[in-house]
Structures are given as structure tokens and as C-alpha cells.
Amino acid sequence: MKGDLIVLVPDRNTEAAVAGILERHPSLHTRPVAARIIVHPEKDPGCRLHGHELLRLYQNDFRFALLIFDREGCGAEESTRTELERLAEETIASSGWKGRCGVVITDPELEIWVWSDSPRVDQAVGWLGRRPGLREWMQRQGFELTSAGKPLRPKEALEAALRVARKPRSSALYRELALKVGFERCLDPAFIKLKEL
């Protein structure tokens, strides 16, 4: 075996976030994980439709396979996150990974993980010390927030905040957030599932 974990993701931002999360193995209460992260060339739809085919190539090289993609943009938005996860897990398991695979689908998309109440989010986004505060600004801009204080349109809210702060949206931002924001602050069901895998 070449490693512990092969992870298939839809884009570079998810790749950077997952790499940062895996570096924080003490916070995950696990040993260091020998992982390889690959990006599907067909993004979210490719992960959903063909992820099992790509992962099949690695079944003799890694102990566990993980597939991550966004519900929004995957081509099956009418399905729930849990329905999509179940179907994808069944498909991957039947392709040779039975008992050694997991699927995490961000809902609606990866940026939902960005929005915790940590001041590190404001710092990474370039909003530290600004008035009004980031969440108040989002509401003033018309971004509806959930009861947990997360925007219903997390990607659009992040992009708008970065534009105002004149900070580029980059993979480095996702990695920085993954490395600095406390895991206990993220109560998103998909993130909790990722921590438990």
C-alpha cells in the first residue's frame, strides 16, 4: 500500500481545504494520515458520475477512499445531501472499495464550511476590525443568514466580502481557514461526517 487515504475532490479550493484539515490530525484525534488528494477534471458532476471509476484505479494502493463534492453544481440538486452520499457510497463500494470508502457532500457547497463564528474567518477574509462586522455587513447586503449565522448563499457571500476587502479568492485562503479555524466551531453536518470518517 502506498498510503492510508486517496481523496477525490472537484477543484483546487477543496483540495487545499482538505489538505489543511488533514494536516491538523491532532484536532481530528488521529495519527498523521498518508494521503493523496486528486482533483477530478470534470469538477462536481464528474465526481458524482464518474468518481468511482477514478477511485477504482487506486484500490490496491490506499486503505481508504474518500469522495468530496458540492451538492450544488453536481447535476442532481433535486436530491438531498444524504441521498447523494448514500448513492455514491454504494457505487464506490461496489467498485472494489466495500467497507473502505466514504462520501462527503457539502451542501450547498464547500464555502458553507468557511462560515463559523471564529474571528479567524474575519481575519482570513480581510475583515478584521472593519465596521460593520462581517455578518452585519452580509445582512445589509441582502444575504439571508441561517439560525446558525451562515449565509444561505455561502459562496456568493464569501466572494462579495472578498471583493469589498480587496482580497483575492484563492486556494491559499481555503487552506488558511482549514489550518486556523477551530473544528469544534463548524457544526455543518457534512463537516461533522468528515471528522468522523
Predicted regions and their residues:
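C-terminal accessory helical subdomains adjacent to catalytic cores in phosphodiester-
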Residues: 1-4, 15-38, 51-66, 70-197
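Conserved SAM-binding loop
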Residues: 7
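Helix N-cap/beta->alpha junction signal
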Residues: 10-11
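Eukaryotic endosomal/vacuolar membrane-trafficking regulators centered on PX-domain-mediated PI3P pathways
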Residues: 38-48
